[in-house]
Amino acid sequence: MKKLILSLSVLSLLFVSCSEDNDETVATPKAPVVGEITGDITTNRNLAFGNYTLKGIVKIKSGATVTIEAGSKFTATLSDGTIDALVVENGGKLIINGTAAEPVVFTESSETPGSWGGIIMYGDAPIVAVGGVTTATSEDGLANPYGGTNETHNGGSLKYVRVEYAGKKITDGTSEMNGFSFYSVGSGTVLENLVAYKGADDGFEFYGGTVNLINAISYGNFDDSFDWQDGWKGQLSTNWYAYQTGTGNFGMEIESKNNNNNFWPKVTNITLKRAAGTLTENNSAEYDAIQFKNQGNGDYSNILIEGYTTNANAVAVRIQDVNTNNNQVNASKIKLTNVKINGTTPQFGGTSTVTTVAFPAGQYTTSTTSTGANLTNGAWSTVGGSSLLQ
């Protein structure tokens, strides 16, 4: 009798368990909202997962925070005749909560490089501009002031964001936008897992500031993959991957506006690759992996360079001018360690005015085991079904 009661109890439990399993509901994927962002944003906004049109220069003003859900897509339109860009002004914040599986994508409907202005952020972190001044006017056609003393400026958090077909050239002939432009942005800002894809200018450009860039891909951008000036001095940047294809100049262009600074940025784990047949923008004669000019400096380690050929105008590391050679190379303010070059690209060189480049002991070292950037592939690093990590 006890055995029968026990058996019935077990059967009862099994029935309940099965019933509970069968009663489980499968969550229905939520439909994306459809919307438009335009004009000045002066109050906090939460943009739910959706498809949005980006129209004109959208400015997140001081005191406002815009938060964007994972998987959202923002589309600019070249054909409407407006200049489109997403601008975060000093005091405003942009929080983008993308994920590896659901990145937030900013693109343009015709897929034309240079068709819009990308993401532009301003802060009040320190800069050192031309003549040693600590404030300057932006080069993006918006003529905004930047520079200050707030090393920990916080412009928000950008995680798993892809910007496509940006790098707008402004018709005045001197102004230009990039994929991502960071004007005096501070170390309180989070930049992680960002992609600049097929823009008509630089993928990423820093104008001074102290912000760090962690896990970044610059793919197919016409000018430089990574570029900075005005005394940018981020210390914790790592895992930068550049792939130049079609058109491209330098993997990294490093300058300091002719200021002989006693500080410099630090970047670890760098991959710089160039596809065969890639041309330079405007038929430029040089297309080096890394170029230092106008007193540019820095500390860089675990570097993998590939595809910069034996052409006389291509070297792994170029020292562009006499002042940079004398004040930065010879004074040990440029350090490149654990450099691996796949192929026969010359290691380093100068120009017609810099006939000899000789790094002090320990300031330039090579390694056969350097790995460069260490990135995990996913939807964030995939376009049209193809991985950007070549």
Regions found by a protein language model. Give the residues of each.
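Glycine-rich loop(s) and the adjacent beta-strand/alpha-helix scaffold that form part
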Residues: 102-103
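Catalytic metal-binding/acid-base residues of hydrolase active sites
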Residues: 73
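Extracellular beta-rich repeat passengers
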Residues: 24-29, 33-48, 54-61, 66, ...
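Positively charged n-region of N-terminal signal peptides that target proteins for export
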Residues: 1-4
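Bacterial signal peptide processing site
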Residues: 19-22
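C-terminal motif of bacterial Sec signal peptides marking the signal peptidase cleavage site
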Residues: 14-17
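Hydrophobic alpha-helical targeting segments used for export or membrane insertion
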Residues: 8-10
